[in-house]
Amino acid sequence: MTRKLRALLGRDGVLTEADELLVYECDGLTQHKRRPRAVIFPQSTAQVAQALRILKQARVPFAPRGAGTGLSGGALTESVVVELARMRRIIELDTLNRRAVVETGLINAQLSRAAAPFKLHYVPDPSSQMTCTIGGNIAENAGGIHCLKYGMTVDHVASARVVLAGGEVVDLHAGGANAPGYDLLGVFVGSEGTFGIATEATLILTPLAPAVRTLLADFADVNDGSRAVSAIIAAGLMPSALEMMDGATIRAVEQSVFAAGLPPEAEAALLIELDGLEAGLDTEAARVESICREHGARHVRLAQDERERGKFWAARKGAFGAMGRLAPDLMLQDAVVPRSRLPEALAAIYRTGAKHNLLVANVFHAGDGNLHPYICYDARQPEEVKRVKEAGREMMEICVQVGGTITGEHGVGLDKIDYLPLIFSPDDMDAMLRVRAAFDPEGRCNPGKIIPTARTCGEARGARPRRGNAETPRSDDAERAARVDLETRQRGDAETLRHDAIATLSSSLNNDDDKAREAIDQKREATDETREAIDDGQQSEPAQSTTVFARHPFNIEAAHEALSRIVGAEHVKASPHPYFAASSRRRVEESSGGVAASSSGILASCLSVSPANQDEACEALRLATREGWAIVPAGAGTWLDAGRASLRADVILQTSRMRRIIEHEPADLVASAEAGLRLTDFNDDLKRAGQWLPLDPPDDEEASLGGIAATGMSGAQGLGYGAPRAFVIGMRVALADGRIIKAGGRVVKNVAGYDLCKLFVGSYGTLGLILELTFKLRPLPAQSSTVIACGPLSSLQRNARALLDARLFPVALELLSPLAATDVQAPIETDEDCALMIRFAGATEAVAFQLAQARAMLKHERGIRHTIVSSGDELLWRALAALPLKASEPLSWRAHLPPGKLDALLAAEDAEGVAPFPAGSRWHAGLGDGRLHVIGALPSTLSAGVKQLTRWRERTRRVGGWLIVERAPREIREAFDVWDDAGAGAFIMGRIKQQLDPSDTFSPGRFDFDS
């Protein structure tokens, strides 16, 4: 194998000598060490693919590595390290579309430096950004100082080229509204190298804010500072950064080269940064200062210039290096708690340090509750090392007890693998393992990381050498029985551990409970022994599906009776949707030669079932799966028939009766609700606290939260706020067998396990039934106003580009065709006029400035008339969102493409001289984010309709986009692929469907991954 690798990569591309390998035995967290057998240095995607094929032939596991700055042991292995440091090119810097295509060995900070001359930057900025790589950021879903306002790495990656364990090269894209199929990219980001190796990435660049204000407040008590954090967020302010250092950290920094003039007697320093337009920024800074003083700030300093601002941030980012003054060694932890629980969690963490006679310092991302306790110690003292490990474990448990998670940005890796059962049940982790098996069936990608269960030979091999001598293989039945027994025991042990730990953790917040600690230790040891047994007994095979039930003919009378016993007869109805009624009649006609009615008069069609709660929903699912019925989940039923004509439904499972708001904590900017709740009702409740969920899907105010998540669709205001995938931070989902799994959590930053939320968002009800969702929220803007400009298409396009280049930051920038403009009552004067709707929202002073600037720009363009709507401008956008549902035309489709390509696509005729749209079409386009929505009539013949759609699909593909048909007559959907091509990732999507829904219970036929 080594000879083959050297033939491919050259002698200097393969390291095998012990002294050469020493540097690769740990990452930034030196407590974990694994000496690799070899380190290889590919220089291209093709070389990575060929190298992984060589490793596959030898059945050798591997771990990808960037700069080795990780802090969880995630890039360590005793096998082969695939080092990407020699793949560091910026392949393309596309400033028009605000994208950069890079190799993943590129250093993070180098990209922002390259983009700076164009007033752009790459937002994710972890403290290690001067050395960490883009690939490492993708693997860990890195955050950084400014992710409070701008999001994590997953929010800034448009696509990734990935090499799977077998050497297959696939391009992954965000799913939902933007691309066909599941959001493979979303679940890949943060997978810590266990799904494959990202070799190239298309990254989203963000305009630099024109103005910045940076404040430094110091406090005599760290709890006062943490309470100020919650108060700032609850006041409706959205800083770009909100960081805290405690007294021990302040004193260490001030004695180092990073000294910034922080008062050494202070016990907390809060660093707050506001950015945006110059207008209104001083007012916001004054509000922040006032809040800090109200909560006990002794001094509040405003950075007077860029030099002083740089000193503040150098002190914050240099804190880790300065900690060396406190002790020879550091154990850095990473956990997240709700902002409102910061004082409680901090107090318990300091008590834990005192209990173990250890100095604990804290420097952390206070705005999102992401704690980083530094435990100071001397690694030369074995007893002290033992106390450090115990203290670190207790700190994790404290954070879980107050509603948090075990990691916000550093990842699980080796360091936190034993803590995962504290936040996820065995069923949750089983679902994660099934998704992992879809990407890597043999388990050779970075085995032994994240999930504390070894499922394959690769996992067992990578975790530790196998013990004992080779034995005579057992029969398949005996092996399967042994594995099931082991997994069952482990599931029980892990679940017991989880409940026991949570039940006893409250004592660790208030006192020392050694007996409780011993009980948890005993359970953990039992779980470890079970895991070792699985490692030693596991065969080489991927995660296997559970029971698969056969399909049976749908007996509507028997189904009606059985379901009525679960939810009540009044909540079971026949023929709720014309599409499925017609589909069912067709099936009956084909099988019996005519439309059949039952003796009770129920038309042979599907049933609609409305459970009142999760228990009823799960019982209905268990029944349906046993009987082999096809289930289609539904909220308001807005997009119930989306997808291929082969979509089949026996039972439509509606969540409309499940509409409770479960929890809303304004100080945390987080709320949870059941999936059947309407978005309008949700926002009406949130507005009382000055907050909202800023989504505007294609809808007529009926869309449910679950439906919005299931389709993943957003509207015009996605430009300024983002799509649903950016707001869903947690969910509970029922699988076909009635088991409920949890994905994510209830904190705004969470990289524990795999982000299965991304998979379910945009899955169109093909993987499970979404029961409840947790969202991160936004402060309600103080002011919103819309400019409507009317005139020739080319003039409006030119002005829209100028508005974007001027960095005025509209939350929506939508171009409307003449008919669409008429529908929303835009004041066009001729049948040729288009309309440009520009919405600004935010602080009152900022919106006034934006409006003035937009008006000034529009005045200089001949032929353009404009008006401003301030009071009630939300009605305009509501009417726009409702267009696809209110239009009488039978066809609607959407496309997504690079924004810079949209202008040409709208204006140009194709090669055959055909105009962009047929006469009578309504369309609107998001000029800032590349969305296009078209509603229109169909030609008189089927072949002409298919030809028309094919022409448009080819045009969008040529510029790097997709076209997805939302609504069309059944004949069109039978003759035309409504979803477009999911690319090489389609086979992974098919595996995911098979792993999570092996009986094909949910929405069968909606997607066709084989084609």
Give residue spans per PLM region.
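Short polybasic linear motifs
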Residues: A470-R474, R480, L486-Q490, A494-R498, ...
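Long, structured ligand/cofactor-binding scaffold of large enzymes
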Residues: E25-L120, N137-G143, E589-A634, W639-E663, ...
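FAD-binding subdomain of flavoenzyme oxidoreductases
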Residues: R89-L96, A100-E243, R444-C445, I451, ...
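Conserved glycine-rich FAD pyrophosphate-binding loop
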Residues: R3, L8-R11, A18-D19, C26-A38, ...
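Acidic-enriched catalytic cores of C-N bond-cleaving enzymes acting on peptides and small amides
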Residues: D224-E243, D282-R301, R798-V811, A848-R865
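Intrinsically disordered, low-complexity segments enriched in serine/proline and basic residues
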Residues: R464, G492, A501-N510, D514, ...
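A conserved active-site cap/scaffold subdomain adjacent to cofactor or substrate pockets
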Residues: P263-C292, P810-T867
